[in-house]
Structure formats: structure tokens, C-alpha cells
Amino acid sequence: MPPPQRFRVQSKNYFLTYPRCTIPKEEALSQLQKIHTTTNKKFIKVCEERHDNGEPHLHALIQFEGKFICTNKRLFDLVSTTRSAHFHPNIQGAKSSSDVKEYIDKDGVTIEWGQFQVDGRSARGGQQSANDSYAKALNADSIESALTILKEEQPKDYVLQNHNIRSNLERIFFKVPEPWVPPFPLSSFVNIPVVMQDWVDDYFGRGSAARPERPISIIVEGDSRTGKTMWARALGPHNYLSGHLDFNSLVYSNSVEYNVIDDITPNYLKLKDWKELIGEQKDWQSNCKYGKPVQIKGGIPSIVLCNPGEGSSYKDFLNKEEKPALHNWTIHNAIFVTLTAPLYQSTAQDCQT
């Protein structure tokens, strides 16, 4: 009679099933994390399910850094914290970690730890058709979910075509942003300096056909909480660029009447698109962090908002000796206003910036 076969599993990916297991998924994950193994764990996912008759069971996927040899069939046993009970799993080595992950994701509720490791031998990573993967990506609920699907199912495309994939998904998942609704009506700003009001009347008081080919921009400097941001954003449809420039179609539109440039340092704007934005240039390109260069229609003025002080003030920046050319250009393309008081009177607007 041959000796009984010794238990032995050798794999980078382990698929565990715990029948009739009442241990919560959080506790199961904690216990699996604490099990000592000679190979480091990289990822654990636990799924808590119930059969139609209400009977509970757990599934778990464990990914190791390299192949792990298990000769102890009790190694992955779980212990109840509420009663004297042990739960022993069915232990299998999984060639396709992605297939196991997809299987345990279908039903029940899951919890995970670590970073999922894409397996090049996975049926989802190689044998499954690209059409299936991309169809699933199109049906995802977000760009990030779609990228995750392609990373797991089409890793070659994800690595070699990431730039194009991301750019295409941004266009596919594009949703027109909800129009911004100002919290305060324009009529509540009663302390507008004459030069600012003249600028508003000159630009917004005309129809689009009667406006100049390259209207003048305006640079407004003032302390925080003077109402300059809320005033600028209450004038009409606009692009709001704050902190940095982003011409991604998700946040920038070519169909607005003006730009609001808020808290963007003059040094940063000089390195980017100073003359294009302040000079109302038409039909120019700007690069996005991801994706192809964006074509900007332009031809609209900018309201530049800044605080006084070194590094923030556009006036101080332009008055430096080394910038006479930029100074002369800017004063021909924009007017400067320095606020000495809030643009509003009501204390209800003290939160304005």
C-alpha cells in the first residue's frame, strides 16, 4: 500500500475557501495578515458571502512576493474570537490571480490589504480578448475604475499605451460640469472702485459682436476677505483657474466669457501662459499633464486676483528692474486696481475672499 500523499502547495497565489465560517471578514483579514510565512505577503482580499439558505462562508486570495511552499494544511486556519471554534479552508494554488479576484468580487462584501499584483499568466491578462476588457472598461463607473480594469486585464496595453488610454478615457467619460452658482448676487457688491466698474461696463455692457478683438484684462490686488473672488465669479460664465493652470476639458471651457485667475503666483504664470491669458491671444495651444496639447480658443479677458506682498503681488513683480519689457507689455494689455476696502458692506459676506 503506497504511503499517503503529503500535503504540499507551491504557488505565488493562494485561493482559500472557508465553508460555514462565521468569522467577520475584518477579523479574517487580520488573522491572515498575522500568519507567519517564509515569503512576504503582497496582497490579501477576503470576501464574506452567504448561500441562499443563509449559511456563511469566506473566500480569500493571498498573493505572495514569490512562490510560497505550504506543507502545513492547518497554516491558514482561522480561530473564532467568540467561541471555541476553528475554521479550516480548502487551499488551492491559483494560476490566474485575476480570475480569482474577479470570482470573489462578484458576490458578497469584500475587504483587502496591500497592492494587487497583476499576473502575466492570468486568463484576464492574456487569453481573454482585448474586446472583452475594453468593453468592461467602457462600462466602468469612473476613469480610475476603467484604468484598473485595463491594468489587470491588458497590462501590456496599460504600460505601452498608458498616455493614449488615459487621454481617450478622459474624453469618453467627460461630463459637462455643473454651472457655478454664485452664493451672493452681483448687486451685493456696493463698494466697487470706479475703474473696476468701468471695466465691467465696457466689456459686459456690449454684445459679443461689439466687443473689441482683444479686450483688456484686469489685475485686482487686495487683502483676503475683501470679496474679490466672489465678485469676479458673479459676473458671468467663466473659467476658474486657482493655484495652478489646468486646461483639461473637464475644468476648462472655450465657451465662456472670461477667465478668473486666482492665487496663481506671477512667477508661475510667467513660466506658463502670461501673454496668452492676460493678452487675450487667440487660437493657441497649452499642454496638459496627461493627454495631447489642448487648443485654446482664447480672445477673452482675464481677471487676475492676487494678494499684496512678495511673491503674490503682480505689481511688485513687474516693478522689478529685470522685467521692464514684461512690465511695459502688461500695462498695455491690462489695468491694475488696488483694493483699500472690502467690495461689500454686509457682514453676511465676511466669509468672502
Swiss-Prot record:
Residues the record marks as active site: 103
Required co-factors: Mg(2+); Mn(2+)
Molecular function via GO: ATP binding; DNA binding; endodeoxyribonuclease activity, producing 5'-phosphomonoesters; helicase activity; metal ion binding; nucleotidyltransferase activity; structural molecule activity
Cofactor descriptive note: Divalent metal cations, possibly Mg(2+) or Mn(2+).
Keywords carried by this UniProt record: ATP-binding, Covalent protein-DNA linkage, DNA replication, DNA-binding, Endonuclease, Helicase, Host nucleus, Host-virus interaction, Hydrolase, Metal-binding, Multifunctional enzyme, Nuclease, Nucleotide-binding, Nucleotidyltransferase, Transferase
Disulfide bonds: none
Family: Belongs to the geminiviridae Rep protein family.
Subunit structure: Homooligomer. Interacts with the replication enhancer protein (REn). Interacts with host retinoblastoma-related protein 1 (RBR1), and may thereby induce the transcription of host replicative enzymes even if the cell is not dividing anymore. Interacts with host PCNA. Interacts with host SCE1 protein.
Name the record gives this protein: Replication-associated protein
Species: Bean golden yellow mosaic virus (isolate Puerto Rico)
Record lineage: Viruses, Monodnaviria, Shotokuvirae, Cressdnaviricota, Repensiviricetes
